[in-house]
Regions:
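Glycine-rich FAD pyrophosphate-binding loop
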Residues: 64-81
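Conserved redox-cofactor binding core of oxidoreductases
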Residues: 130-222, 242-243, 291-293, 413-432
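A glycine-rich dinucleotide-binding beta-alpha-beta segment and adjacent secondary-structure elements
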Residues: 401-484
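Core beta-strand elements of the Rossmann-like FAD/NAD(P) dinucleotide-binding domain
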Residues: 41-43, 221-230
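N-terminal secretory signal peptides and thylakoid transit peptides that target proteins
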Residues: 1-14
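An anion/pyrophosphate-binding glycine-rich loop and adjacent beta-alpha core
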Residues: 268-270, 274-394
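Glycine-rich loop(s) and the adjacent beta-strand/alpha-helix scaffold that form part
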Residues: 226-294, 493, 502
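Beta1/beta-strand and adjacent pyrophosphate-binding region of the FAD-binding site
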Residues: 39-51
């Protein structure tokens, strides 16, 4: 089967063995379903979501000899791998060892715990770090090409103690292309079926509350039941679902979702309907640094800020109260913490003609000097004015407040006093007109809350009891399990692949020893 067929076509599944009767209703069922259907007549492993965790899970389950089905509501596979940076991390992978970098999965675990403020799930973090090297080695074996510099320390987040983050030469697509090829092989072999444009609606349960399948709807609106001995949810996060953000994370609703529109929390919603426990739902990190076109705000994104150590700004950052709120050169964790306290998750970068003329590298990533001059003239992204009061008026913030903030900043430089936020580098007086500013907001690429699982990746309920037949992996778990309250380099994409492979083995083994006393 050609890759484009996977990407764009709806591929028929295993037929009547996996297909229940077609329902006449066209609307989504809202209640938890209970049925007497016999899962012994169904597929072994049904995987819902053909993305970062779902593809590896399908490959692994098929390799174990299972009768496997993979479904996705999109008309393509790959999920967030299509757009993400694809950073993965692990200790003692072969690439790292060839470079003679001393590391261990214990150190990886300890670093991740530290960066996550010791709020990560210890069992799941240990599982992820212990198996990370094998995951990276496997990716290399199937043809993933990492940059020559990998593993590296990533500056966008707090650093590990040693370089252990791997980046594909074409970012996440370097991972996706080989994974697609491996998926093709299993489909051609005959024990893996895939259905695209197939949206999961509800989880099916028998009288004993064991999950035995999924109710789905195809693009024509037809509803059917797919029966399975085990079900794995790999549906991703909920960043594109504003109502869920409003319910669980109202403070970050104003942040711009920069992922794909399919991340609507479907798996989380379905699991919660049948009693699954959710975790970390009140925690969602909005990353500072998204530069907006102010005339098109909040929908028009321009690019991103550059941060230390690649770039130390000569500008100052002020919030909507016209006040500085952080050392502009601080650590990623301190920067994110300070940013999350700001009104509407927004601030302005303010500078003057002196700074604009002296900039060695620009605050805005990938901009040239010529582009900066063009944007100053257009006034879409960079706003200019002859005085600080006029600039504040254009920005809609306190004129006197901005004047006072810049005056205090300048006076401390002139008098040789310590910066009130501890900034030590690139302290230049801002006093030469014209004055400039551009707006910076927050963005959300993934979500921290999701389904709770045990160390076997079985979904658990509010009492900690296993919901039989149901498993989960990837962002549907939420990154908070592994990142705690921080952002840990390579601990979203990497563990999704790792957990996808691990959960497939567990689900398949359990499918093989399963018997049901229920009859149709």
């Amino acid at each position: 089967m050609k890759r484009r067929e996977i990407l764009k076509a709806t591929i028929l599944g295993s037929g009547a063995a996996a297909l229940g009767s077609i329902a006449t209703e066209k609307s989504q069922a809202q209640q938890t379903l209970a049925t007497n259907l016999n899962p012994q007549k169904s597929i072994d492993v049904l995987i819902v979501g053909a993305g970062n965790a779902g593809i590896p899970a399908a490959i692994e389950a098929a390799d174990m000899g299972g009768n496997v089905m993979l479904i996705d509501k999109n008309d393509f596979v790959g999920g967030m791998l299509i757009i993400s940076g694809g950073h993965i991390s692990g200790a003692n992978a072969k690439i790292q060892m060839r470079k003679e970098i001393e590391d261990s999965y214990e150190k990886h675990y300890q670093d991740a715990m530290r960066i996550g403020k010791f709020k990560a799930n210890s069992e799941l973090l240990a599982l992820a770090t212990e198996h990370a090297a094998r995951m990276i080695d496997w990716l290399e074996e199937i043809g993933v090409e990492f940059t020559d510099e990998s593993p590296v320390l990533v500056d966008d987040h707090d650093h590990y103690s040693v370089p252990r983050t791997y980046i594909g030469k074409n970012l996440a697509r370097s991972l996706l292309w080989p994974l697609q090829q491996e998926l093709d092989k299993r489909i051609s072999r005959g024990n893996l079926d895939i259905r695209l444009e197939t949206k999961a609606l509800n989880l099916l349960q028998d009288k004993n509350k064991k999950v035995i399948g999924v109710r789905v709807k195809n693009k024509s609106g037809d509803i059917s039941d797919l029966l399975a001995k085990t079900v794995i949810l790999t549906t991703g996060g909920y960043g594109a679902n504003k109502s869920m953000q409003q319910q669980y994370n109202p403070k970050v609703v104003s942040a711009k979702w920069v992922g794909l529109p399919h991340a609507t929390g479907d798996g989380i919603i379905m699991a919660k309907e049948i009693g699954a426990k959710l975790a970390n739902m009140n925690h969602l990190i909005s990353y500072p640094g998204t530069v907006f076109d102010l005339k098109g705000f909040p929908t028009a994104i321009s690019t991103r800020l550059q941060f230390p150590p690649k770039h130390y700004t000569q500008s100052v950052w002020v919030n909507k109260k016209a006040e500085r709120f952080v050392n502009e050169h601080t650590t990623p964790d301190n920067r994110e913490t300070a940013f999350l306290k700001q009104e509407e998750l927004f601030f302005y970068v303010v500078f003057d003609k002196n700074v604009s003329e002296q900039l060695g590298t620009l605050d805005i990533r990938n901009w040239t000097r010529e582009q900066m001059d063009q944007e100053i003239n257009s006034g879409n992204i960079i706003i200019s004015a002859g005085s600080l009061k006029q600039l504040a008026a254009k920005l809609g913030i306190s004129s006197q407040g901005l004047v006072d903030t810049i005056r205090e900043y300048n006076e401390r430089i002139e008098k040789g006093k310590r910066d009130q936020y501890g900034r030590t580098k690139q302290r230049r007086i801002i006093n030469k007109p014209p004055f400039f500013a551009f707006g910076v907001g927050g963005s959300v690429l993934n979500t921290h809350g999701g389904i709770s699982v045990n160390s076997s990746l079985e979904v658990i309920d509010e009492d900690g009891m296993v919901i039989s037949g149901l498993y989960a992996a990837g962002e549907v778990l939420g990154n908070g399990h592994l990142m705690g309250e921080g952002v840990v380099s390579g601990m979203s994409v990497g563990p999704a692949i790792t957990f996808g492979r691990l959960v497939a083995r567990t689900a398949y083994r359990n499918a093989q020893c399963q018997c049901s006393d229920e009859t149709v």
